[in-house]
Amino acid sequence: MRAFKFILFVAIFAMGLNGAEVSLRAKVSQMIMVGFNGASTKDAAFRAMLSDAGYERFGGVMLLGRNVTNKTQLKASIKAIKEKSPKIFIAIDEEGGNVSRMKDKSFDGPYPSAYEVASTLDIKSAYDLYSKMAINLKECGINLNFAPVVDLHDENSPIIAAKQRAFSEYASKVVIYADAFMDAFKEQGILTTLKHFPGHGSSKEDSHKNKSEVTLSKDALLPYKDAISTGRAQIIMVGHLFVKGIDEDNPATLSKKIITDLLRNELKFNGVVISDDMLMKGVGDEALAQKVVKFINAGGDILLFSEFKINNQRTADLVTQIIIDAVNEKKISKE
């Protein structure tokens, strides 16, 4: 079983704390990111999230469309969160196009999709566009973006190509536009996330709703190889994808063959591995506890949940206890 990389978690999510001073529960909580309802402190759900943030019951929050109306509102919301938890990660899905939380004009938006950018803009213009996007996110207080998508554009894909989320069908073109995206965000001090490893483009299904099978290809891996070799890859999001011929029993999110053998050992990625939303249908029908343990033992670092509660229980509390129990039962080993 894979040992916890607690030093990594503390370094990323709890900078400034002495490792000896951080309890097991505190360390485990930093492995969890949650979504929440509400867009201001007037909302009860938002206040509940703020309370938990103050007690550091999770390492980060993810912002969805339900949390964003305009720039003034978003700044105020994030200010309230950071007053409770100054070192928390504030993440957003801002790809542009269909997957955008910054459609309001106050964000200098809306921003075009990845496919539109790569089809109409040269690299310099793309960099300038993504710089504007990054500046707007930074001004609001966001420090992590779940983008860029580095999947390949395949016309048969209902979730990637149909929504124009990929830059191109050509891996070399994906690489140069993804580099422009990552470089623009790095300049503003915002972390980026390559997704959806090992490549969602060939899937004929939407992993939000159904089991999604993909065929692994050298081209699909090229954007990851390039970003890892150049040092641009900071965080990689693993998709709920069943990879034919490698692990047809587990989605990539729960697969040691994909995360440890392929991503860690073969591609030499030493950064942070985050799951796609663990509440998506594509992750399978196993019990939540089994999924959580499998993800960690497969080599994953951070668990992402889009909802603040699961069956009326706070997600962070539930998942933290699952992990602690697994450690105590030696289902997960601890360094």
Where are these regions (language model features)?
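Preference for extracellular/luminal or secreted protein segments
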Residues: 19-51, 265-266, 285-335
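Short, well-ordered coil/turn segments that N-cap beta-strands
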Residues: 28-30, 57-59, 86-90, 142-143, ...
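Sec-dependent N-terminal signal peptides
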Residues: 4-14
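Alpha-helix-loop-beta-strand connector modules within alpha/beta enzyme cores
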Residues: 81-90, 169-189, 252-273
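A general structural motif
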Residues: 38-45, 216-227, 252-259, 283-288
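Aromatic-lined glycan-binding groove of carbohydrate-active enzymes
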Residues: 191, 221-236, 241
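Structured alpha-helical segments in the cores of large, soluble enzyme domains
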Residues: 48-52, 182-185, 221-229, 258-266
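Enzymes and membrane/adaptor proteins characterized by extended Gly/Ser/Thr/Asp/Glu-rich
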Residues: 54-174, 201-213, 239-252, 277-323
